[in-house]
């Protein structure tokens, strides 16, 4: 199935609540979703490196 049809399918209310899952609204990725930010890890990293997420910066120790 195409990614857009899978995004539409994920938005529908599932028959059982355990079947519900999150997708990244930017790229549609179903895995590695960060609930706190509502995006996937790859989009999170790209946005953090560009400085688009306030209060987030690359760690260094």
From Swiss-Prot:
Cofactor binding annotation: Binds 1 zinc ion per subunit.
A family per Pfam: Ribosomal_S14
Keyword Electron transport: no
Names of required cofactors: Zn(2+)
InterPro entries: Ribosomal_uS14, Ribosomal_uS14_bact, Ribosomal_uS14_CS, Ribosomal_uS14_sf
One GO BP annotation of this record: translation
Binding locations of Zn(2+): 24, 27, 40, 43
Top-level taxon of origin: Bacteria
Keyword vocabulary terms for this entry: Metal-binding, Ribonucleoprotein, Ribosomal protein, RNA-binding, rRNA-binding, Zinc
MF (Gene Ontology): rRNA binding; structural constituent of ribosome; zinc ion binding
GO cellular-component term (any): cytoplasm
Described purpose of this protein according to its UniProt entry: Binds 16S rRNA, required for the assembly of 30S particles and may also be responsible for determining the conformation of the 16S rRNA at the A site.
Subunit structure of this chain's protein: Part of the 30S ribosomal subunit. Contacts proteins S3 and S10.
Family of this protein: Belongs to the universal ribosomal protein uS14 family. Zinc-binding uS14 subfamily.
Full protein name: Small ribosomal subunit protein uS14
